[in-house]
C-alpha cells in the first residue's frame, strides 16, 4: 500500500491530480515475527503458481551474530559447523527448504562477504546442488540509507531461479558509491559474481 500511495503522490505532482483509489482494495498482509523461525508455508499461499521471495535481511556478520542466531543457522543448515556464515544466509536456507515443493525465485540484498572466502562453498554449494542458478547479481556496492544509524557495510544483490533462460545479468560498480554498469555475461554467473561456471 505504501508504494502505491507514493506512486499516486508522484502522479498527482506530475499531472495535478491523483487517481481515485478509495475505498482501499489493496492491503498488505504483514506478519510480525522472526522470519527464520516462522513456517513460510503457513504464510505464503500454496495456490500461487510462482512465489517470489526478496528482501533485505539483517546485516550481521559471523562476529556480530548472537549465540541464538548462530544456533538458528545450525538448525537451518542442518550442521553444527556453520563456520563464518553470515546471519543473512539463514534466509537462503529457508528458501531452499520452502522451494523444495514450490516454483519461484528469490533474491536478497546481503553483505558482500557471502561471495568471499569459506562462505562461498558453504552457501552456494547447497544452492547450486539444488538446481538453482544466479539469474542476476549486483557486485559489491556501499550501502546507503536515509535512516539514522544506518549500517556501514558493503553489499551485493543476488537473485536465483531454476530456469535456463534468459541469459543472466550482472552489474558492477566502478565507483563503489556510484551507479551500476552492466557487465557482459556468457551462460552463467558463479558464486564469486564473475562470468563463469560454478
Regions from the language model: what does each represent?
Residues 1-20, 24-25, 35-198:
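Signature of N6-adenine DNA methyltransferases within the class I
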Amino acid at each position: 500500500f505504501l508504494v502505491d500511495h507514493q506512486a499516486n503522490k508522484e502522479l498527482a505532482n506530475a499531472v495535478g491530480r491523483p487517481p481515485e483509489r478509495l475505498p482501499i482494495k489493496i492491503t498488505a498482509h504483514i506478519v510480525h515475527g522472526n522470519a527464520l523461525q516462522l513456517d513460510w508455508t503457513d504464510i505464503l499461499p500454496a495456490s500461487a503458481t510462482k512465489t517470489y521471495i526478496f528482501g533485505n535481511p539483517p546485516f550481521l556478520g559471523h562476529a556480530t551474530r548472537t549465540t541464538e542466531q548462530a544456533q538458528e543457522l545450525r538448525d537451518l543448515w542442518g550442521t553444527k559447523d556453520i563456520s563464518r556464515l553470515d546471519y543473512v544466509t539463514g534466509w537462503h536456507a529457508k528458501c531452499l527448504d520452502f522451494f523444495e515443493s514450490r516454483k519461484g525465485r528469490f533474491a536478497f540484498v546481503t553483505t558482500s562477504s557471502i561471495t568471499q572466502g569459506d562462505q562461498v562453498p558453504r552457501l552456494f554449494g547447497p544452492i547450486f546442488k539444488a538446481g538453482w542458478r544466479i539469474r542476476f547479481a549486483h557486485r559489491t556496492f556501499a550501502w546507503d540509507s536515509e535512516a539514522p544509524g544506518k549500517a556501514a557495510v558493503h553489499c551485493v544483490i543476488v537473485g536465483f531461479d531454476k530456469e535456463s533462460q534468459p541469459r543472466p545479468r550482472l552489474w558492477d560498480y566502478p565507483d563503489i558509491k556510484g551507479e551500476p554498469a552492466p557487465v557482459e555475461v556468457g551462460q552463467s554467473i558463479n558464486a564469486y559474481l564473475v562470468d563463469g561456471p560454478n
